[in-house]
Amino acid sequence: MMDFIRGKGGLVAHLGTSDAREVEKRIADGDERAKLVYDGMLYSAARAISGLAAGADGQVDRVILTGGMAHSRYVVDYLTRKVSFIAPVEVMAGEFELEALAAGACRVLEGKEQMKVFDSYGANA
């Protein structure tokens, strides 16, 4: 179970790799199992995005796809088909989490934005 938790689940468990580029190459080469597993993973991501929209009472201005996998046309096209009914989909490929946190801290320190405090459930306190 610990192996599963520590990165041996998901794509690795099903396809022996965590490299999305390799999985997409296998799909392009006709590997139906790779397509089934990858599409299943993306379907789960689309469901999660939809669930977050429901939690926001549908008040969503944009769905923003970030992270390394947002460089993939396959991923972006799949997720856009599934979630664009919620709001326009925007792609900001790459991993910008630390930059976003730093920029937010600067806005608070400069008095441009109020600091937000979240409780242990992630709700704005």
Where would I find each of the regions flagged by the language model?
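Adenine-nucleotide phosphate-binding core of ATP-dependent small-molecule kinases
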Residues: 3, 7-58
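A glycine- and small-aliphatic-rich helix-loop capping segment at beta-alpha/alpha-beta transitions
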Residues: 78-87, 112-114
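Active-site proximal loops enriched in glycine and acidic residues that flank catalytic Cys/His/Asp
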Residues: 5, 27, 64-68, 93
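Short, small-residue-enriched loops and turns at beta-alpha junctions
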Residues: 11-14, 67-71, 98
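Hydrophobic, well-ordered secondary-structure elements that form the walls
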Residues: 45, 63, 105
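Glycine-rich phosphate-binding/hydrolytic loop that grips phosphoryl groups
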Residues: 70, 90-125
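Short, surface-exposed connector motifs at secondary-structure boundaries
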Residues: 56-63, 85-88
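Glycine-rich phosphate-binding loops at beta-strand->alpha-helix junctions
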Residues: 60-79
